[in-house]
UniProtKB/Swiss-Prot annotation:
One of its GO terms (biological process) is DNA-templated transcription termination. The lineage of its organism: Bacteria, Pseudomonadati, Pseudomonadota, Gammaproteobacteria, Enterobacterales. It comes from the Bacteria. This is Transcription antitermination protein NusB. HAMAP family: NusB. GO terms for molecular function: RNA binding. It comes from Edwardsiella ictaluri (strain 93-146). Signal peptide: none annotated.
Length: 139
């Protein structure tokens, strides 16, 4: 699968996770609705599904990794940034095949696309602190 298809999968995952976080609907329903309503022709759909289900089923674990390094309380974190950080930390901790630098860079790029002004700097800072904990060998 092309890297661009993976990037699109990450973008879609952030959008779907944002919806899940706000609506509190079942993740399977969010996935079905997203795939039926969005254009996913250039998306690695299998990777999208993995990110969505993986983040949803590991949300507490992922939040536990990021909470100690945040400059604010977890519940004060914006929902967009939370979705982006969850995807990136999921890749760092659960997808050893995704290179360390790729996971961090993709998180930064997602923040540039979806986040508020300068949120990419915040995301970068959090990932720089979390990454060595879950990838001590930096690979």
């Amino acid at each position: 699968m092309k890297p661009a298809a993976r990037r699109r999968a990450r973008e879609c995952a952030v959008q779907a996770l944002y919806s899940w976080q706000i609506s509190k609907n079942d993740i399977a329903d969010v996935e079905y609705q997203f795939l039926s309503e969005q254009d996913v022709k250039d998306v690695d759909v299998n990777y999208f599904r993995e990110l969505l289900s993986g983040v949803a089923s590991n949300a507490e674990y992922l939040d536990g990794l990021m909470a100690p390094v945040l400059s604010r309380q977890l519940d004060e974190l914006g929902q967009v940034e939370r979705a982006i950080l969850r995807v990136s930390i999921y890749e760092l901790s659960k997808r050893q095949d995704v290179p360390y630098k790729v996971a961090i860079n993709e998180g930064i790029e997602l923040a540039k696309i979806f986040g508020a002004e300068d949120s990419h700097k915040f995301v970068n800072g959090v990932l720089d602190k979390v990454a060595p904990q879950v990838r001590p060998n930096r690979k």
